[in-house]
A protein has these predicted regions:
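HotDog/MaoC-like acyl-thioester-processing domains
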Residues: 1-16, 104, 115-168
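Non-catalytic linker/capping segments at the edges of enzyme domains
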Residues: 1-48, 167-168
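Hydrophobic core residues within well-ordered beta-strands of beta-rich domains
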Residues: 33, 92, 108, 133-137
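Short structured motifs
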Residues: 33-39, 94-99, 122-124
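Residues located in well-ordered beta-strands
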Residues: 38, 97-99, 111-113, 140, ...
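Soluble, non-transmembrane catalytic domains of enzymes that act on hydrophobic metabolites at membranes
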Residues: 46-48, 64, 156
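Hot-dog-fold acyl-thioester-processing enzymes
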Residues: 52, 57-76
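Hydrophobic beta-strand-centered segment that forms part of the acyl-chain substrate-binding groove
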Residues: 80-118
Length: 168
């Protein structure tokens, strides 16, 4: 059985393993299953998640619903942070801010990127002296025609599991 790191690693280059990873994520986060989010692309420092243009993701004028855009933004940043941070840290959503630029009328793609330098500067170094930190993560979502649909700022609280008082 593959562990989380192995599954993410294989999903970088294999559509079969991306499909398996998406199935696992549907089970881990059942709230997202009806939206049919799919990890479209993943590499060492970024992830792109597809928000399909399907009826359950529509608003009242058959555009992509604002809440679906917010949820795919949270999902993409959370998935990459979990992959990069591993099991040592707990992440929990503190705040989510959305700015909507254009009405989505096709599949949308939310992309989040962080590199090791960003993690060192914004997560690991601050956690050496703080019990918990809050990091802002910027997620941009584009439609199939490359129109900028939304920009999300997701603030994640990060804390070492050994400092958490209420266990999962």
């Amino acid at each position: 059985m593959l562990n989380q790191d192995q599954l993410f690693e294989k999903a970088k280059s294999s559509s079969l393993y991306r499909k398996i990873l998406n199935s696992v994520l549907y089970k881990m986060v059942p709230f997202n299953k009806p939206h049919r989010f799919q990890i479209d692309k993943i590499d060492d420092d970024s992830i792109t998640v597809k928000l399909p243009y399907i009826k359950r993701n529509f608003n009242h004028i058959k555009g992509v619903h604002a809440c679906a855009l917010a949820t795919v933004s949270e999902f993409s940043s959370g998935a990459l942070l979990l992959r990069k941070l591993g099991r040592k840290y707990r992440i929990i959503l503190q705040k989510l801010e959305m700015e909507y630029h254009y009405q989505g009328k096709s599949d949308c793609y939310a992309t989040f990127s962080v590199d090791d330098n960003w993690l060192k500067e914004n997560v690991f170094s601050p956690l050496e002296s703080e019990e918990k930190i809050v990091v802002p993560c910027i997620v941009k979502t584009f439609d199939s025609d490359e129109n900028l649909i939304s920009t999300a700022t997701i603030k994640w609280q990060i804390k070492s599991w050994d400092k958490v008082k209420t266990k999962a």
